[in-house]
Amino acid sequence: MNLSFAKGGLPAPVKNRAWQYCQMAWRGVTSKKALSRLAALSPLLLLGVGQMASATDLLAGGKDDVKATFGADSFVMMCIIIAELIVGVAMYIRTKNLLILLGLVVVIVFTTVGLTFIK
């Protein structure tokens, strides 16, 4: 019974066996036969790239739905503005600071302008 252990805790022959398998796999990939097959198939792979690039846009029909949901005149925009108003008024009542109401106007303008870019 061989109980000699290497540093990692596994027997030395197990580590060597794994390394030998890696070396055999690398030799198989880099052999002249494998490289010649790769050289013969690479032009065929390049011919197929043009066929894969042509496709139909499956999400083109959803563009109108996105505009209706997140556009400038949408229901989501109305909900965002109402939420901003509620939070702004609550913050003003809590702090009694008029600059918060000015900030509320600025935030509403920025969100309105930002959501108009959704085309």
UniProtKB/Swiss-Prot annotation:
Residues 91-97 are cytoplasmic. It is a multi-pass membrane protein. This is Pilin. Propilin is the precursor of the pilus subunit, pilin, that forms conjugative pili, the filamentous surface appendages required for cell-to-cell contact during the earlier stages of bacterial conjugation, and that retract after contact is established. Mature pilin is assembled with the help of TraQ and TraX. The chain crosses the membrane at residues 70-90, 98-119. Its main location: membrane. Residues 1-69 are periplasmic.
